[in-house]
Amino acid sequence: TLMRSSAASDVYKRQIVNYYVHSSNHVRSWYLSGDVSQNIDALNGQAGLNVGYNLSGTELLLEEVPASYENSTLTVAPRFNFRFAAWVNTEYRLEYRYTTLSIRGREPDGRHDFNQRLTVNLVPSKKWVIQFTAEHYYSQLSADRSKHLLLADASLRWKINGKWEATATAANLFGREKYAYTTFDGVSSGSYRYAIRPRNILLGASWKF
């Protein structure tokens, strides 16, 4: 892709000043991904893996000096779904990302981040269904700083009879209400803020006719 402007960045009094300069600039990018899954009869389940790689590059001006840079992201996402017993079903998913920023004349800067989710369903009898869900988020901010977030939910369903059913759900058991962090890679900075619904308990009943 041929663009008619180049990004530029200057450091002025410890502030990053971004602007555009009228010039020709080439932007290149490509993406590769693959997915595979396999049934595992011994565990009455399935395992899968998705892998993706994205690479993009262009040129920018750092303090009025042209510099080429590349940004790459490797994504690895395994998943598992097993039934260890007739009354236990477990699902686990992980998405891991490694992002690298490479600028000519500088050491590459790499960051890790991932999120994972575990869901366990218990069916001790035909009348009861219990579910637990846990989520973990991790973001690397710098070489020695990182951010974590852990969430958990639980639910219970009781089939009273052929028509009546009662449910109870407890969401955000740890009471986390926000998740915020800022990243800086020497070229740009980004601030991320997520609002989380406060801890709550919901009770319900339904009737089939």
Model-derived features: positions:
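Single conserved hydrophobic/aromatic residue that forms the stacking wall/gate
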Residues: 1-8, 12
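Membrane-embedded beta-strand positions of outer-membrane beta-barrel proteins
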Residues: 6, 47-51, 78, 90-94, ...
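Transmembrane beta-strands of outer-membrane beta-barrel pores
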Residues: 9, 51-59, 94-102, 134-140, ...
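Residues that define the transmembrane beta-barrel architecture of outer-membrane proteins
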Residues: 26-32, 68-74, 108-114, 148-152, ...
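Residues on the lipid-exposed face of transmembrane beta-strands in outer-membrane beta-barrel proteins
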Residues: 32-38, 76-84, 116-122, 154-158, ...
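Repeated loop/turn-to-beta-strand initiation elements of outer-membrane beta-barrel proteins
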Residues: 40-47, 86-91, 126-132, 162-168, ...
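C-terminal beta-barrel architecture of Gram-negative outer-membrane proteins
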Residues: 90-159
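C-terminal beta-signal and adjacent terminal beta-strands/loops
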Residues: 138, 158-209
